[in-house]
Amino acid sequence: GFNENLLNDAINLALNSETLWPYDLGAANNIPGLTDIEPEPWNRILGPLKPRGGPSGLLVYKGYIAAKWGDPTRVDMTFSIAKSYFSVLTGIAVQDGLIDSVDTPVATTLRDKTVSSYFRSDQNRGITWEHLLHQTSEWEGTLFDKPDQVDHFREVGPGSINTRKGSKRKLQKPGTFWEYNDVRVNLLGLALLSLFKRPLSDVLRERVMAPIGASDTWSWHGYENSWVDIDGEQMQSVPGGTHWGGGIQISTFDHARFGLLVHRRG
């Protein structure tokens, strides 16, 4: 069991640690700490933004809900947690034989000429799936009007200083340098789309979310300019976050189901 007083202290800490971000990012037309410090046109919002609610959360212990606060059924934007969904989808691609190994170069895996063109340069042809997953790809290029340079020198976490963010730096060999770069993460999403040849939200719903009993309230939004031709059909590539809008909008309950799946190793 839990110490009720300590449990209540933890819940109160969560309730009192609400973000200072505006409730309506669409009205603000920027993402604090990201697009508000980026120059035009790199800072342009490309995907939908949804007004947020207050703090909500769950404490799950041994598969049971031990505590909850706020409204865990409310659907909110959830930013970089989308990267975890990319990881699981990559695992499914390996399981289905679409990727031989995460150590395989992406360039040798993709059959779509348009998508594979992003990996043809000397800098990019040695990038593996693991590099994309670990954010060590050092990919160079522009995707959906966003250059990789926009996140050069980006810092994340408490105490981050981003005065150099977006300044050009010398690229390293893929696999040797880590950088939190959303353009490169979004490239992983496009590469997965070209493998599955289906919208990633459809694959996620069919292979993961429906089997674990998730609701039908979640959605995964792309950018206005992220539509691509896959075997003659227009499909929208989705991002691994909400840096420029879009991304996964989902409830706390559904996130918890997904988290429990990962905790139990699938």
Where are these regions (language model features)?
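Active-site-adjacent loops and short helices of periplasmic peptidoglycan-processing enzymes
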Residues: 45-55, 79, 92-136
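N-terminal leader/targeting segments and the immediately adjacent pre-domain N-terminus
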Residues: 1-71, 96-99, 194, 198
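Solvent-exposed, acidic/flexible segments
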Residues: 4-7, 52-53, 75-82, 99, ...
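Active-site-adjacent helix/loop patches that line small-molecule binding or acyl-intermediate pockets
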Residues: 107-112, 118-217, 253-256, 260-264
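Penicillin-binding protein/beta-lactamase superfamily catalytic region
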Residues: 176-178, 202, 222-266
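Surface-exposed intrinsically disordered loops and tails
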Residues: 26-45, 158-171, 224-241
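Active-site SXXK
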Residues: 63, 77-102, 132, 188-192, ...
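A generic structural motif
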Residues: 72-73, 265
